[in-house]
């Protein structure tokens, strides 16, 4: 910011409280946990810097690399007959590769026109529950494990998580031509990549 350089900041759906969505970029924030509060503080610092910037909120990221839900489900599905997965939290899983591509498009747009500063949302489509996402993973990987729906209350975590992580991404399409990726297509590619590894 001190050098007048534009920058891109990646944030999260956790800045919201999980009330029914999809959430728009300008909707009021209300994080439920420390992670969400620190990400919101990061957003506020970016805006206060005075530099040209884009804040990109995303959620439920998956990839053939690193630790993520898809890789966890593949591991569990290969080892168990049944997997209990939360069915009352919904979101739109985006592939990491699509996020990277969106970031490049946004960074170039901001470089050309610093007036493009703002906050945007990017996630996959269509919306899905964790349990249905797990079923899609089992189907795509041809794993026989059954997915049993459970409520989030039966899967305690150290931090509260939003029940509805859907993000409205229409602003990205209108302003930058960035379309939500279909996670089903990308899931097939990620699983094929992992099987070939």
Residue ranges and their predicted role:
Residues 44-91, 96-98, 104-105:
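NAD(P)-dependent short-chain dehydrogenase/reductase
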Residues 26, 33, 91-94, 128, ...:
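Residue-level signal for the nucleotide or nucleotide-sugar donor/cofactor binding architecture
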Residues 153-175, 180, 190:
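A hydrophobic C-terminal alpha-helical subdomain
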Residues 183-197:
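Amphipathic terminal alpha-helices
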Residues 85-90, 120-127, 175:
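Glycine-rich Rossmann NAD(P)(H)-binding loop
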Residues 2, 6, 14-56, 60-61:
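Catalytic helix-loop patch of NAD(P)-dependent Rossmann-fold dehydrogenases
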Residues 102-103, 109-159:
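Mid/C-terminal beta-alpha module of Rossmann-like enzyme folds, strongest
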Residues 97-108, 184, 188:
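Amphipathic alpha-helical segments that line or abut small-molecule/effector binding pockets
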